[in-house]
Swiss-Prot record:
It is an enzyme of class 3 (hydrolase). It comes from Campylobacter jejuni subsp. jejuni serotype O:6 (strain 81116 / NCTC 11828). Disulfide bonds: none annotated. NCBIfam families: PRK00015.1-3. One of its GO terms (biological process) is DNA replication, removal of RNA primer. Residues 16-191 form the RNase H type-2 domain. Endonuclease that specifically degrades the RNA of RNA-DNA hybrids. This is Ribonuclease HII. It is found in: Cytoplasm. Its EC number is 3.1.26.4. Manganese or magnesium. Binds 1 divalent metal ion per monomer in the absence of substrate. May bind a second metal ion after substrate binding.
Length: 191
């Protein structure tokens, strides 16, 4: 019996039972990290790694994905990340995803480790080749960006609507100028 990972040809074959998992904001200096899991109801066109899509295209695909899937989006605040650490937040997210999809057992997480959570397969760059992981990538990224756009209104000096809280040169210069705000991750090297 062939499995999803038997041949390269199968990477592009659609498996209706597969649940893709990805996160966005893992390396951001502020704001939440979002995790998403997605089980598509049908094959959707145009899906790929969210980082390779324009913001407009991600937004369009987000709406299509949520109408054609069973999905879960989780948020881990900067306070949770500082208190628990990234690994614990990621493990918690994977456990919550498994609990949400309790009758399912075909999970694929983008990356090289399942953090010790049984029943979750991993694949590096799965968001670029597996539709369900691409969909999860888009759900997580759009959710993260929407949160940062909303939070930017309360913290305009950090330009979160532009940098989405990632460690860009401009963002680091703003931290140096204004100091940190309550959204910044104190456990991260910010400068």
């Amino acid at each position: 019996m062939k499995t999803l990972f038997d041949t390269k040809e199968l990477l592009n074959e659609f498996d209706i039972n597969l649940i893709g998992i990805d996160e966005a904001g893992r390396g951001a200096l502020a704001g939440p990290m979002m995790m998403a899991a997605c089980k598509l109801n049908k094959k959707l066109d145009g899906l790929c790694d969210s980082k390779k899509l324009s913001e407009k295209k991600r937004e369009e695909l987000y709406e299509i994905i949520i109408k054609n899937s069973n999905y879960l989006i989780l948020a881990f605040s900067s306070e949770q990340i500082d208190a628990l650490g990234l690994s614990t937040c990621l493990k918690t997210g994977l456990k919550l995803i498994k609990k949400h999809f309790k009758t399912e057992n075909n999970f694929l997480y983008d990356g090289n480790t399942n953090l010790g959570i049984n029943g979750i397969k991993t694949q590096i760059k799965a968001d670029a080749s597996i539709l369900q992981v691409s969909a999860a990538s888009i759900l997580a990224k759009v959710s993260k960006d929407r949160v940062m756009n909303f939070l930017a209104k309360d913290f305009p000096c950090y330009e979160f609507e532009k940098n989405k809280a990632y460690g860009t040169k401009a963002h680091k210069e703003l931290i140096a100028k204004f100091g940190i705000c309550k959204l910044h991750r104190k456990s991260f090297k910010l400068l």
